[in-house]
Amino acid sequence: MVMRVPAEIQGELLKGVAITSSFVHASVALDNCDEKRPQLPDRGHDDNRRRHTTLYALYDWFMGWDQQWLRDLDDDLAVYSHDHGLYLPPVGSGYWTDGDLQSNVDTAWPLPDDAAGLLPAAISETADELRGVTRADIQSVLMQVPPSWPVTDEQLEGLGWWMERRAPAVAGRIEQLASS
């Protein structure tokens, strides 16, 4: 799910663990779930007609690969995405380079699932959210990458450029889902 953490709840949650206002994508910890591949399952359950729309956006924006969906068996089969280690170009490799980002920045990468049954309002909302993502939003997320991770500031800067540049085109492709 893609959401914005509001400023009203930012701050220290536990000693040494803080949350900041920003866009986030996350899955909750599910105690009773199963995994489905590759198609998004159970569109008619829970709020999946809305949730699936954000997953189409995530997949296209970050050039997803190896679709893995968790179904919450205790919550009307709500669907979540997980394991994004093979996202970003070159897809399926588990790493990216500036050259790969630059050469794929304008590449459409739609989720290959049938889009029938998505909630029209969610399509519009998701496209609007993508168009509303600012450089500051992206920076706030990328600045949370722990220094111990094997990625340089230059690589994160390149990823930020790529995200910013792709967002409007992905928004346009998400809007096109309404006619499918």
Listing of model-derived features with the role each one plays in the protein:
Residues V2-R4, Q68-D76, Q176-S180:
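Short alpha-helical "patches" and their helix-cap loops
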Residues V5, P41, D47, T53, ...:
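Residue-level detector of functional hotspots within protein domains
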Residues E12-L14, D74, L156:
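A generic structural signal for short, non-catalytic loop/turn and secondary-structure boundary residues
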Residues D31-L40, Q144:
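Short amphipathic alpha-helical segments and their helix-coil junctions
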Residues K36-S93:
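Conserved kinase catalytic-core segment
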Residues A78-S180:
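C-terminal catalytic region of ATP-dependent kinase domains
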